[in-house]
UniProtKB/Swiss-Prot annotation:
Belongs to the argininosuccinate synthase family. Type 1 subfamily. It is an enzyme of class 6 (ligase). The lineage of its organism: Bacteria, Pseudomonadati, Campylobacterota, Epsilonproteobacteria, Campylobacterales. Its EC number is 6.3.4.5. It catalyses: L-citrulline + L-aspartate + ATP = 2-(N(omega)-L-arginino)succinate + AMP + diphosphate + H(+). This is Argininosuccinate synthase. It comes from Campylobacter curvus (strain 525.92).
Length: 406
């Protein structure tokens, strides 16, 4: 029953949709609303969200605006990149990885303020509704989850605008605001809707907000060195930085050199296909560099097992199962594999390309020049290969002698 909810924590951006939701919750549920606005690097000024919430009657003590950039990168982005996680071969999971953190903090604020409900602005067609709500139920299953898009009759843009106008909610589009449905954080920007709903329609060049076109990138390449400790980047060109600082700097470098644009059609967890365009400049560099440092610090068995586990791990994140036992189990295995992933990777950035120029590890290098040299060596006896090959061929030999044809 709607009257059973007394206080609701709303994931609030300050935009039109969540402002309408705020007013709708007050009107339909007759409840007190707590707004939570997370700074996860979306690059927008967040204080206007406070003014809008106040204008809609939210008490000052019920307005939470928090900088979660360091926590986002340290506890969510970096663990995911230790796994080299990619969904369906291309998507670096920029939206997927942000939702668990926002939902977790909502549940924590609910406990802090004595709220008995939570709400979000995700629509009934997308993956985000699943990601938010699975996180809510994992953290506090006693919270009432309110999803306006699955309840109200404001099912068109015209109805939403009429409701906003009726209730004095500002519907003025900010100058320079993209007409596309966008999601932005420190890892990526995504674009959906409008002409992108036709998968055969190329995106306009002025849609991209972050990365320059590779054609317009500098004609001179840039070489950087990324330092790694236990699988996480910790420095750029020898300068130690915090997780958020690392990603911010890699974003700047990647965007400048036209790195990180992506146009794909993905399979949503809810069953439909969706076309989206993404900009992930820093993440694109991190993925390539991390695989490079792993190539000399992980043994073959560990590296291959990680590659086998990665699609399942990526799917769990995409589908919203960040707080699931199976994701935590996989994370423990992945983190164990990173204990010796230490060293430096030299990377060249040039017109949309990330090229590995070198990789080194002072204490954890498994690349042995003594064993792999093409020159004469004294540590490897080629005759040992004879028995190795025969043992591996034994099943073929037996099958062939029994008349099996291959």
């Amino acid at each position: 029953m709607k009257k059973d909810v007394k206080k609701v924590v709303l994931a609030y951006s300050g935009g039109l949709d969540t402002s309408i939701i705020l007013k709708w919750l007050q009107d339909e549920y007759k409840c007190e609303v707590v707004t939570f606005t997370a700074d996860i690097g979306q690059g927008e000024e967040l204080e206007p969200a406070r003014k809008k919430a106040l204008a809609l009657g939210v008490k000052p003590e019920n307005i939470f605006i928090e900088d979660l950039r360091e926590e986002f990168v340290r506890d969510y982005v970096f663990p995911m990149f230790r796994a080299n996680a990619i969904y369906e071969g291309e998507y670096l999971l920029g939206t997927s990885i942000a939702r668990p953190l926002i939902a977790k903090r909502q549940a924590e604020i609910a406990k802090l303020t004595g709220a008995d409900g939570v709400s979000h602005g995700a629509t009934g067609k997308g993956n985000d509704q699943v990601r938010f709500e699975l996180a809510y139920y994992a953290i506090n299953p006693n919270l009432k989850v309110i999803v306006p898009w699955r309840e109200w009759d404001l099912n068109s843009r015209e109805k939403l605008l009429a409701y906003a106008e009726k209730n004095g909610i500002d519907i003025t589009r900010k100058p320079g605001k993209s007409p596309y449905s966008m999601d932005a954080n420190l890892l990526h920007i995504s674009y959906e809707g409008l002409v992108l709903e036709d998968p055969n329609h190329a995106p306009e060049n002025d849609m991209w907000r972050w990365c320059v076109s590779p054609k317009d990138a500098p004609n001179e390449s840039e070489i950087i060195t990324i330092g790694y400790e236990k699988g996480d980047p910790v420095s750029i060109n020898g300068k130690k930085m915090s997780p958020a600082e690392i990603l911010t700097e890699l974003n700047h470098l990647g965007a400048k050199h036209g790195i990180g644009r992506l146009d794909l059609v993905e399979n949503r967890y809810v069953g439909m296909k969706s076309r989206g365009c993404y900009e992930t400049p820093g993440g694109t560099i991190m993925l390539k560099a991390h695989r490079a440092i792993e190539s000399i610090t992980l043994d073959r068995g560990s590296a291959h097992l990680k590659d086998e586990l990665m699609p399942r791990y990526a799917e769990l994140i995409y589908n919203g199962f960040w707080f699931s036992p199976e994701r935590l189990m996989l994370q423990a295995a992945i983190d164990k594999s990173q204990e010796h992933v230490n060293g430096e990777v030299r990377v060249e950035l040039y017109k949309g390309n990330v090229t590995i120029l070198g990789r080194s590890s002072k204490d954890d290098n498994l690349f042995s020049e003594a064993y792999c040299t093409f020159e004469e060596d004294s540590v490897y006896n080629p005759k040992d290969a004879d028995g190795f090959i025969k043992l591996n061929a034994l099943r073929f030999i037996i099958a062939s002698k029994n008349g099996r044809k291959f």
